[in-house]
């Protein structure tokens, strides 16, 4: 199977790194019995970033390796040591790459300009350690927040060639020969249609003007509706400042002539849309052929009446090539002068709304089993649930405090929720709770440092945990001894049975 050297469309799965977990640790130092919390924050996960690289001209790398992952952030450690951030995955793409969401079709970005960047998957934020969670009411939290998952997104990359001039025309009109004659480009040239299947770029110097020319693959009638890969070919013209029609004056196909070819291609450009205002130039090619030269003379005035410059050239003999280069340079200079200057990007600061209830919404839904539940959605509640370690009762109490401060409990009561109702926080993978309203805030209760009396914690002490470990290992040893005894009895029974059979023989 041949490996394509030019790929202008690829689907990429970008997976950002996870954030590291925060650390729950208490400083232990001689003569400092109350050293306080010293758990560090987790590191942020790495992001997946697209960056325009002038050395890259194709998307072939993502055609073969379609999944790219950034590294995860490290978890925090004691002694206030924060975890290291994950490394960003920088992916080089050619200039003119259009990025869209493969599932929704949403346009994410249009990368034009060397060094332009776009974050396609943001890394997860690291969880806070208990040192960052401490306050006057919770002096030594016995928990930390978990790191958030990184974004995972499937994106579609489409390359639209960035060039000053696009050469358009029927297959075998001589576009590849023309770009090879006026630049150092070396396209594939052969005597059959659709020799060129991917755009070829060439740099042309005419006096003090330097510009790029794109040899767009041949167009046919119906290209604007997708016939003959028309969609793939036409999109490469969208960024060109000017369009040059290359007309074959030596065609011998029945039903074709230079003027009708020009009308057909121009009609396809108009039907594609967005190209009406681009300046045009018409090249009457292959005038080295006697009959073609006569035909070019006949139609020259008819084509010129359209208001476009017309050039007679021959890529074989070199006739008219030098004047054509300067004519295209003049076209490019005018197009550049008419381009509006890019306005500086305005930075708009939008403060968050003061009414925090806008940060979530609550709906009553069926649970699929004949009952119902209350579903709480919103960025903050969903993120807070993902950060919570549900194996730690104190962390669950902290989550309850945050939801109450946000107004979730008050809103549930206003909508008619009662104690014991099922409450789901998040989307389809939500965590479901039993609603327990009117719980006092942990700050209003007298307790030892870091404790939350709303929850009857069954967490054993350090001494009890050591005793449980010893009991566990003792039980495993007894279990192992029973197994060994059973295997010994089985072996002795088998030996006795064999001896009995031997005695009978």
Swiss-Prot record:
HAMAP family: GTPase_Obg. It comes from Cutibacterium acnes (strain DSM 16379 / KPA171202). Gene3D superfamilies: GTP-binding protein OBG, C-terminal domain (3.30.300.350), GTP1/OBG domain (2.70.210.12), P-loop containing nucleotide triphosphate hydrolases (3.40.50.300). Pfam families: DUF1967, GTP1_OBG, MMR_HSR1. GO terms for biological process: ribosome biogenesis. Residues 163-333 form the OBG-type G domain. Mg(2+) binds at residues 176, 196. Coiled coil: none annotated. Belongs to the TRAFAC class OBG-HflX-like GTPase superfamily. OBG GTPase family. One of its GO terms (cellular component) is cytoplasm. Residues 29-48, 447-472 are annotated as: Disordered. It is an enzyme of class 3 (hydrolase). PANTHER family: DEVELOPMENTALLY REGULATED GTP-BINDING PROTEIN-RELATED, MITOCHONDRIAL RIBOSOME-ASSOCIATED GTPASE 2. Monomer. Its cofactor is Mg(2+). The keyword Metal-binding applies. Residues 4-162 form the Obg domain. This is GTPase Obg.
